[in-house]
Amino acid sequence: MTSAALKPLSVAPARDRAASRPRIAVRRWLFLMAALVVAMVAVGGATRLTGSGLSITEWKPVTGAVPPLSAEAWAEEFAKYRATPQYDILNRGMSLAEFQVIYAWEWGHRFLGRLIGLCFFLPLGWFWWTGRLDRRLGLGLVGLGVLGGLQGAVGWIMVASGLQPGMVAVAPIKLAAHLTLASAIFAGLVWLAAGLDRPAEAAAPRRLRLTALLLPVATLLQIALGGLVAGSKAGLTYNTWPLMDGAFIPPVSGLFAATPWIENFVDNVALVQLNHRLVAYALLALALLHALDARRARPGSGAARRAAALAGLVAAQAMLGITTLLLAVPLWAGLAHQVTAMLVLGMAVAHARIGTLARG
C-alpha cells in the first residue's frame, strides 16, 4: 500500500482531535468583539452627551474613514455643519476649533464602527476557512454580521432625523433603536462566546433557568427605555428620587397629556422617565429574587454565585442611575450608567447561557 493511500487515514484522526479541542481562539475573539461593542456604546454615549452627533452631515461608509486633512477640507466640513438647524438654533457663533472637537467625537464613533467591522469579518472568514466553526455557530455569526451592517444604516437614519428642518437633536425613538440594536448584537456575541466548550454544570431547577433567561430580556428592555430617556432628555427633568414632582407616580393626566396617547411613551418626558424607573425596580426585584432562589436551591454552586454577582451589579447600576438623575446627568455619570448597563446585560446573558448547558 502506498504512502498516498495511507495519508487520508492518518489525517482524519488528527482532524477529529482538532475539532474536539476547546475553541479557545474563537471564544476569545468573540469576547474581544463584545468588548469593542461596549467601547462603541461608550463613545456613542460621549458623542451624544457632548452634542457632537450631528457634526458630520453625510454618510460615506468608505471615503468617510479619512478625516479632513487640510484647512480647505475643514472649512468645507464646517460650512456643511453651519447649514444645519442645530448650528443655527444652538451653536451659532461656534468657532472652527470648537467644531473640530465635536467632529472628532462623531468621526471617532464612526471610525470605531468601521474597525469593529474589520475585526469581525476578517477573523470570521479565517475561522470558517480553517474549520473552527460548525454550521450552527457560523450561521449565528453571519446573522450578527448582518445586524452589524444594519446597525450602520440605522445609525445614519438616526443622524438624518436630527438634520431635518427645526431639529436640534436626533429622534428619540431612532436613538433608542440604535442603542437597542447595539445591545442586542453585544448580547449575541456574549451568548455565543459563553456557549463555547463550557464545562456543563448540574442542572438547576427549571424555574431558575427560566428566570435566568428572563433577566437579559428585561435588561434589554430597560436599555431600550434608557435610550428613550436619553433621546428625549428626560433625565434632565424630575431630578428627585424616589418621588417625581412630589408623587411616586405623577397624575395620569400629565402622563398622557399628548394625543394620540401612544406618542406619550416616546415624547412625554414624565412617562418616559417613569417607565424607566418602574422597569428598573422590577429588574432589581427579579435579580434579587433570582439570587435568593438560586442560593436556596443550589447553595454554593456556580449558578448561585453568578446569580448573586448579577444581583449585586444590578443594585449598583440602580444606585448609579439614581445618582445620575439627582446630578442632572453629568458626562461621567451618564457614561458610567450606560457602560454599566452593558455589563449587566453581558453578565445576565452569560449566566443564562451557561444555565442552558447544564446537565439534566
Curated annotation (Swiss-Prot):
It comes from the Bacteria. It holds the Pfam family COX15-CtaA. Belongs to the COX15/CtaA family. Type 2 subfamily. GO terms for molecular function: metal ion binding; oxidoreductase activity, acting on NAD(P)H, heme protein as acceptor. Heme binds at H276, H337. It is a multi-pass membrane protein. One of its GO terms (cellular component) is plasma membrane. The chain crosses the membrane at residues 29-49, 111-131, 139-159, 175-195, 210-230, 269-289, 309-329, 330-350. It catalyses: Fe(II)-heme o + 2 A + H2O = Fe(II)-heme a + 2 AH2. The keyword Iron applies. Catalyzes the conversion of heme O to heme A by two successive hydroxylations of the methyl group at C8. The first hydroxylation forms heme I, the second hydroxylation results in an unstable dihydroxymethyl group, which spontaneously dehydrates, resulting in the formyl group of heme A. Keywords: Cell membrane, Heme biosynthesis, Iron, Membrane, Metal-binding, Oxidoreductase, Transmembrane, Transmembrane helix. Pathway: Porphyrin-containing compound metabolism; heme A biosynthesis; heme A from heme O: step 1/1. It comes from Methylobacterium sp. (strain 4-46). The keyword Hydrolase does not apply. Coiled coil: none annotated. Interacts with CtaB. GO terms for biological process: heme A biosynthetic process. Its cofactor is heme b. Its main location: membrane. It is found in: Cell membrane. This is Heme A synthase. Its EC number is 1.17.99.9. It is an enzyme of class 1 (oxidoreductase).
